[in-house]
């Protein structure tokens, strides 16, 4: 049997065709998510928000009801303009949600900048998130009394921050290994007492790892102290003593966590 060697130029061309063909492309994750985009007029008003965002659980045309909405804020590894990053972060939540028999919309936005590098102007911004939520309620069948917020690491900070300024948006929140300042884990917001008063109004479970060297669990203790000072009795601090910065994987992998979260409705 004879062996034929392709000339390098031909081989390179063949590989390029393969890479750009439907056969050679890496298929989109089979996670049921769709990528949607803010209208340009709204996107132009944002500070540090990718106009694209991930949506899961959108019902078929003709659906007349309302669904709960789970908002997931990614960590620092999700920052940028590659919407696949937050998509991959939120993917592991889908299985436990199914096991908990919870039908919900899930939206995962993307922050485009680092708050530390951009001196507080990057990362999660209240104005951006307010604009996004208003758009979601306008365009998706969202039950505004069943909006839930969670996030990991930088997204845990975003959860504290957004709910700390806008508690009326949410039925319950669950920050994971979240800092409490805009410039990183060692920073503390100047509005800690305000956050405490506002977070005291919400059911909250905040999760940390006892061995976390990135965001130490004492950040959670500080926010709990502020909530307690305001008379709050709905918040819990849960520390997994043997876990590090990956502590959020524990509740995110438990159907019982989602059953707790979705058991709440917004108080009017």
Regions found by a protein language model. Name each.
Residues 23-69, 190, 221-225, 235, ...:
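A domain-start/cap signature at the N-terminus of enzymes
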Residues 62-67, 76-116, 182-183:
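Short substrate-entry loop that stabilizes the transition state in hydrolases
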Residues 73-75, 208:
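The conserved beta1-alpha1 loop
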Residues 119-140:
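Alpha/beta-hydrolase active-site loop
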Residues 145-198:
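Primarily recognizes the serine-hydrolase "nucleophile elbow" in alpha/beta-hydrolase
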Residues 198-204:
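Short, proline-enriched alpha-helix->beta-strand connector loops that line the catalytic pocket
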Residues 207, 213-268:
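C-terminal catalytic histidine-bearing segment of alpha/beta-hydrolase fold enzymes
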């Amino acid at each position: 049997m004879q062996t034929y060697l392709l000339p390098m130029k031909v081989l390179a061309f063949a590989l390029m065709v393969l890479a750009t063909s439907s056969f050679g492309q890496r298929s989109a994750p089979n996670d049921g998510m769709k990528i949607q985009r803010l209208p340009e007029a709204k996107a132009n008003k944002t500070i540090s928000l990718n106009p694209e965002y991930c949506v899961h659980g959108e019902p078929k045309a003709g659906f007349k009801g309302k669904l709960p909405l789970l908002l997931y804020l990614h960590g620092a590894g999700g920052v940028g303009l590659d919407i696949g990053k937050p998509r991959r972060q939120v993917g592991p939540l889908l299985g436990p949600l199914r096991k908990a028999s919870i039908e919900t919309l899930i939206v995962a936005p993307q922050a485009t900048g680092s708050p530390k590098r951009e001196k507080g102007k990057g990362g999660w911004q209240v104005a951006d998130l307010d604009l996004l939520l208003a758009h979601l309620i306008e365009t998706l069948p969202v039950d505004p009394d069943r909006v839930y917020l969670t996030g990991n690491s930088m997204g845990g900070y975003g959860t504290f921050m957004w709910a700390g300024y806008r508690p009326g948006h949410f039925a319950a929140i669950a920050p994971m290994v979240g800092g409490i300042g805009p410039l990183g884990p060692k920073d503390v917001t100047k509005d800690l007492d305000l956050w405490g008063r506002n977070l005291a109004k919400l059911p909250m479970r905040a999760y940390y790892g006892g061995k976390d060297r990135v965001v130490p669990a004492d950040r959670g203790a500080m926010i709990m102290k502020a909530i307690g000072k305001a008379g709050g009795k709905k918040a819990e601090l849960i520390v997994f003593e043997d876990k590090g910065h990956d502590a959020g994987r524990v509740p995110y992998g438990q159907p019982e966590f989602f059953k707790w979260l979705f058991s709440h409705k917004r108080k009017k």
